[in-house]
């Protein structure tokens, strides 16, 4: 595996190449950390604009993935193969500045991806 960190202005966090005996696979990956585990909810949020940015920054020979890293588990979704008919889309009320108490609320188109759509998950140790 060869891992490349993306520049700060990039839409994703890293790219990596996985090499086997007969081929190479290329991946464009976004990492999201969450303070709560899947026992508290059955979906993970992803802003629609972020989803579009990730797909637009993914090269033709790459697959786009998003990793949700939670306190006790990791959930991985293949955004290149995500069935949008099974994803809930809502105008979610989000603070314009995430960690500010005085921030105004903005209605933001957000996808809520069911955890059951993950292509892989594991328990963190």
Regions found by a protein language model. Name each.
Residues 34-58:
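Mg2+/Mn2+-dependent nuclease catalytic core
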Residues 12, 60-62, 90, 101:
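Intrinsic-disorder/low-complexity regions
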Residues 9-11, 24-28, 59-61:
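Short connector loops at helix/strand junctions that flank enzyme active sites
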């Amino acid at each position: 595996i060869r891992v490349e960190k993306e520049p700060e202005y990039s839409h994703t966090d890293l790219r990596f190449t996985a090499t086997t005996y007969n081929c190479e696979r290329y991946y464009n990956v976004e990492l999201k950390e969450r303070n709560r585990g899947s026992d508290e909810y059955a979906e993970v949020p992803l802003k629609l604009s972020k989803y579009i940015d990730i797909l637009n920054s993914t090269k033709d020979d790459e697959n786009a993935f998003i990793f949700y890293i939670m306190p006790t588990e990791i959930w991985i979704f293949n955004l290149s193969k995500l069935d949008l008919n099974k994803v809930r889309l809502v105008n979610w009320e989000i603070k314009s500045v995430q960690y500010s108490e005085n921030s105004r609320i903005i209605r933001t188109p957000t996808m809520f991806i069911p955890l059951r759509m993950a292509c892989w998950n594991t328990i963190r140790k």
